[in-house]
Amino acid sequence: MLEKCNAKHVVKIKANLLLKTSEVIEHCFHTDTNVDCTTVVYYLNTCDGFTHFENGSKIETVENRAVIFNSQIPHGGSTTSNADNRVVLNINIHTKS
């Protein structure tokens, strides 16, 4: 996956496991790092959770989908209400050239 993202250097990789809640809970906006780099949000399962951005866009959690954006763009996640959990990898990288 890192090759497909044109990664030169990994800044940080973190796994998030969000447990099922009775209703989807939207989390606050944040940035993953203070380093100006590229963020890759990679979904390991499909559920009704999502990643949302300040401009109002929402990306549905679909297994094997990756969302790629500048690390300085605030974003937030959510829980899931229709699966046992929501599993996401947050990968921060410097890209080649």
Please tell me what each predicted stretch does.
Residues 1-65, 72, 78-87, 92-97:
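Fe(II)/2-oxoglutarate oxygenase catalytic core
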